Each structure stands twice: as C-alpha cells, then as structure tokens.
A protein has these predicted regions:
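Positively charged, polyanion-binding regions of nucleic-acid-associated proteins
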Residues: 87-90, 94-116
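Leucine-rich, amphipathic alpha-helical/linker segments
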Residues: 10-13, 17, 26, 93, ...
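Short, small-residue-biased leader/transition segments that mark boundaries at the very start
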Residues: 2-5
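Short capping segments at the starts of secondary-structure elements
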Residues: 29, 115-118
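Accessory, usually C-terminal, subdomains that scaffold auxiliary metal cofactors
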Residues: 141-206
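Short, positively charged loop/turn segments that connect secondary-structure elements
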Residues: 50, 128-148
Length: 206
C-alpha cells in the first residue's frame, strides 16, 4: 500500500468518472502538459464551462492518474461501464488518505458490526479523531470538513455500497479477480466481501 499523505484531501469536483474518461487520452499523451494547458484554457473535452471548476477537475484527475501505473489505466479503458466506477473508487481510496481512513475505520467496521449503516455523524467522529492527531486536518474549516464528508458519502452511494436509507451493502462487481491479480486483495474487503467470499475468488484463480 502506497503511503498516502493526509494532505491529499479531496478538494472538490466529486467522482468525475466521465471527466476522467474524457481526459485520459491527454494524460496518456507524450504532450501531456501542453494538452492539459490547452484544455484549461479552451475546454475542448471536459465541457466544464467555469474555468476555475475546470482547473480543479484537471488537478484532481491528474493526481488520481499519477497515483496509478500507466498499465492500470490501459486496463481501466477496457473495463465495462459497470466496472469502471468501481475501479475509480479503488483509485480514490489509493489517492486520498482521508477517504481511505474513513473507509477502513468507519465503513468496514460498521459493516462488520450489528449496525451495517453509515451516517454523516459516524464519519464526523472519525474526522474529530484524525483532527486530534493531525494539526493540518484540525486547521480545516467546518465547511471544508462537511464538503469532504459529503463527497465520501456521495461516492459510496454512486457506486452502490450505500443505499438511500444509509444502509451498507456488498458491492456488486464483475471483475473482483482483477484486483487479486494486481496484488490489491485489500480492495475486496473494502467492497465489503466476507473472508470466505474472498477465499472463494482466490480459489477460482488457482
């Protein structure tokens, strides 16, 4: 697991799946910097009218892109429309330490408890614990903290781990073996699979 800095907070823009797909050819190009600069100015592929929002989206997507290997993004492009959002969730957990902490310390724990639900208040408690040991996070405004919590819960709903009543459910994913093959078995637990389910998938690859 890559050591992620707590300062890599998700700074807005949200999930950005369609925008990621639009920007990938630019990021994969040898003329990346020139093409991204042109996109910031001319809005050729993102179709985000406000320049400030466009710059933020390019920054976030570039950060996520650089977290992963070029080979991963080649794989990403041939995944199905159902698999790509889950793969992007995987990338986000790898990119943003704060989201990874929320997921491991709150969501997975609550899934393994009687509750099997996650609400804003549960995430806020974890935020307060992080703030107590990290001065940088402690310096964030309440509005910023609220945005980060909202972004995380929105991501969970978008990929289907969290329903409208805040109940957690196992993520329905058709390419779980892929994450085992690239040495990221922790992600299956992040998708709320039980150990016996993970073992069954491992055995199918043997």
């Amino acid at each position: 697991q890559r050591q992620m800095c707590i300062r890599d907070r998700i700074t807005g823009g949200g999930f950005l799946l369609n925008e990621t797909l639009a920007l990938l050819p630019l990021l994969q190009s040898e003329d990346r910097e020139e093409l991204l600069k042109d996109e910031r100015l001319n809005n050729r592929v993102l179709m985000i009218n406000a320049e400030t929002s466009r710059k933020k989206a390019i920054l976030e997507i570039s950060r996520r892109y650089d977290t992963m290997s070029p080979a991963f993004w080649q794989d990403f492009l041939v995944m199905t429309a159902a698999e790509q959002p889950i793969a992007l969730f995987f990338v986000m957990l790898k990119t943003y330490k704060i989201l990874f902490d929320f997921h491991v310390n709150v969501t997975i724990r609550r899934w393994n408890s009687v509750a099997k639900s996650v609400k804003r208040e549960d995430i806020l408690m974890e935020f307060n614990e992080i703030s107590a040991r990290d001065a940088f996070v402690d310096s964030w405004s309440e509005a910023t903290k609220d945005k980060v919590i909202s972004a995380y819960l929105s991501i969970l709903r978008k990929i289907g781990i969290l329903d409208r009543t805040n109940q957690l459910q196992v993520l329905d994913c058709t390419n779980y073996p892929y994450y085992l093959q690239i040495g990221e078995s922790w992600f299956l637990e992040a998708c709320l699979l039980q150990p016996y389910q993970i073992e069954k998938i491992k055995n199918s690859l043997a």
